[in-house]
Structures are given as structure tokens and as C-alpha cells.
Amino acid sequence: RYHNDVCHMMNGRTYQEEIDYIVTNEARNRFITKLTVDLKGNTLVMFQFVEKHGKVLVELIREAVEEGRKVFYVSGEVDASDREKIRGIVEKENDAIIVASLGTFSTGINIRNLHNIVFGTPSKSQVKVLQSIGRGLRQSDNGQVTKLYDIADDFHTKGYKNFTLKHSAERIKIYTKEGFRYKVYPIDLKGTQLPKDNDDAI
């Protein structure tokens, strides 16, 4: 949940304006970084935009992790053979982090030994990702459970519900349909800045 001033400023914004604000929000990116670093096990962080989000996230995460913890970056810029090498390495690790674009996993997440998935960018294409991973979020053959952290961005005001909040409701329908167990945790995102066309800051 964002500061009330931010919610009112975002009221009526286009979908692209909403996304641009979300992926460049420093407090949100810090939250994703802390969540990712604090998680135990192999963690996949997924993003949609390479330059303005993916590269920012991977740098923040690399700065925050303890020395020796492996952090990998995967986007369309990375050769398919290198992606396979990364996947093979991670399958042998127990505490690695992969920061990857949604496009590179649009046909499914094929990494065994994956403990956590973090959706870093709200995207309508996440529905396709959820459908493709299907059984991957259920208990695996060896008893391991993969946990998904889906960040829903709430800018709603009286009489207005923002795009990404509505999309998160669609994903929850999929969780219910697929039989996933889920919990909703409210997060008060402190220190969020106002959209750039406003001179004030919070």
C-alpha cells in the first residue's frame, strides 16, 4: 500500500504511467532487494523491463548479499547456452539468486531445486507464467515446496481501483483454481516518492 498522497496522484493514470512509476520506485526496489536477500534457498526474481528495472534490481541485490553468495542475471541479452549453464549451476547450489526477465521464462520455469520465486514487476504476462509453471508451485517429487512472492501494488482510492491491483486479483483467481495455498500480507511502503511531475516528495 502506498502513501495516500501517492494514491491520489496516481488516480486516473494510464497503465504505462502506473508501471513506469512502480518499476522506478526506490522504496519498492529496496523492499524487493531486502525480501530477496533475506529468503533462504535458491531464489528467482522476475522482471519485465531490462534497462529500467532488471539491471537496477540486480545491482541492488549484488550490493546487499553476503560475500560468496552467487547472483546471476538472465535476460534476452544472455545467450541461450549461457542461460543453460546458469540453470545447471543453480541446480547444484542451495542459496543462489537469479534475476531474470519474464520473457526468458515465458514457456515455463525449468529450474529444479528452486525454493522461491519473486515477481518483481507487475505484468499481465504473469498469468501466462503462472499457467506454465503450474505444478512447479506445488510440492515437488522430493518434498520441496516452491514459494511464490507476488507483489500487488495498491494505489486504490474511493471509487478508483488501479490497473495493477486489478491484475493481482486475476492472479489470485489462478492461485485458487490451481489449488495453491496463499496468504495476503499488507505492506506499508514507506518513503515512496510522488510521481515525477509533482515537485513535492514524501
Predicted features, each with a name:
Residues 7-64:
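Conserved interdomain hinge at the start of the Helicase C-terminal
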Residues 40-41, 68-69, 94-95, 114:
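Short, high-confidence coil segments that cap the C-terminus of an alpha-helix
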Residues 19-25, 74-78, 95:
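Short, flexible loop segments at the rims of nucleotide/cofactor-binding pockets, characterized by
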Residues 42, 180-202:
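Long, largely alpha-helical accessory region at the distal end of helicase-like NTP-driven motors
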Residues 44, 62-85:
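Conserved RecA-like helicase motor-core motifs
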Residues 1-7:
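Short amphipathic
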Residues 76-181:
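Conserved RecA-like P-loop NTPase helicase motor core
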Residues 42, 70, 144-147:
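Residues at the starts of beta-strands that form the adenosine-phosphate
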